[in-house]
Regions:
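Transmembrane helix exit motif
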Residues: 60-73, 113-135, 235, 257-267
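Membrane-interface helix-boundary motifs at transmembrane edges
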Residues: 75-79, 129-133, 174-175, 238-243
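Small-residue-rich hydrophobic segments that form or flank transmembrane alpha-helices
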Residues: 3-83, 87, 141-144, 151, ...
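Selective transmembrane alpha-helices of multi-pass membrane proteins
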Residues: 88-93, 104-124, 214-231, 242-265
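Membrane-water interface of alpha-helical transmembrane segments
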Residues: 46-52, 105-108, 130-137, 243-247
Length: 267
């Protein structure tokens, strides 16, 4: 596969991630699926799961800058991170181990539905009402395991899951965003490890530049582009109204989600 399209994808995902504060996975996964299908680099049955696995590996490195920035700003609620991150990490790792067993069409449909939900949230600018106290051990474990599993299955770092959850449990938005960014690194690392170790369970996935289910060639290009573009995205976000950006991207994501759902019918 040519390096330029991968670098371009990294630039776009980093730019949008910096502008909108979203996980790059919502851009990387559908774009990689299209690139893999056009290049015939992987078989059609493996395209979706490889795109998800590679996305998780990309997010490990691209989320470092966001986590560091939030740490320096002093907005991270470490007591919340300590309660949730072990369960999110476990859920993401389990997703990496089990998702390769999913039927290709089912996996793509599930990701399409998730993207459809994210698009709706952006278009409607929806935020949950802060109405409950933070849960105890059982509630934290169930929340973390389920949220981590969805994050790992969809190839995202968890921000689209973590932030609404924390706000729902009465955590201020800026603290929820900061804590989510901090949790993104271990969640993505756990998911990527699961996909790397889970690869031997999937027949027919092998070749050069492959670490389990992670396409290292794609990872290199996307990561390089995202690291370059993310700081620029943050600067743009300070000059352009965030609500407008989210609605525009939400409309684009709606089209992507519908395409994902349609293409899942042919797998």
């Amino acid at each position: 596969m040519e390096f330029i399209p991968l670098l371009s994808l990294g630039l776009v995902s980093g730019l949008l991630g910096g502008m909108l504060g979203i996980g790059g996975g919502v851009v990387i996964v559908p774009a990689l699926i299209v690139l893999y299908e056009l290049s015939a680099r992987h078989t059609s049955a493996d395209v979706t799961v490889i795109a998800v696995a590679t996305s998780m590996a990309c997010i490990v490195f691209t989320s470092f800058s966001a986590a560091y920035t939030q740490f320096r700003a002093g907005k991270v609620k470490f007591e919340l991170v300590a309660k949730l991150v072990p369960f999110f990490v476990l859920g993401s790792f389990l997703a990496g181990l089990s998702t390769p067993y999913f039927d290709a069409g089912l996996l793509r449909a599930l990701i399409g539905l998730f993207l459809l939900l994210v698009a709706a949230v952006m278009l409607l600018n929806w935020r949950p009402n802060a109405s409950r106290a933070f849960p105890g051990v059982i509630g934290s474990s169930l929340t973390g395991l389920s949220g981590g599993y969805v994050s790992g299955m969809a190839g995202i770092a968890g921000g689209n899951v973590i932030v609404p959850t924390l706000v729902y449990f009465n955590v201020p938005m800026h603290n929820a965003t900061a804590s989510s960014s901090t949790m993104g690194v271990p969640i993505a690392l756990a998911g990527a490890a699961g996909y790397a170790f889970g690869a031997p369970m999937v027949s027919g996935v092998s070749g050069e530049w492959m670490l389990g289910l992670i396409d290292l060639q794609s990872w290199l290009g996307i990561t390089a582009g995202a690291i370059i573009a993310a700081p620029l995205g943050v600067k743009i976000a300070h000059r352009v109204p965030g609500d407008i950006l989210k609605r525009v991207f939400g409309g684009f994501l709606l089209l992507v989600a519908l395409r994902m759902l349609y293409s899942s019918l042919s797998l």
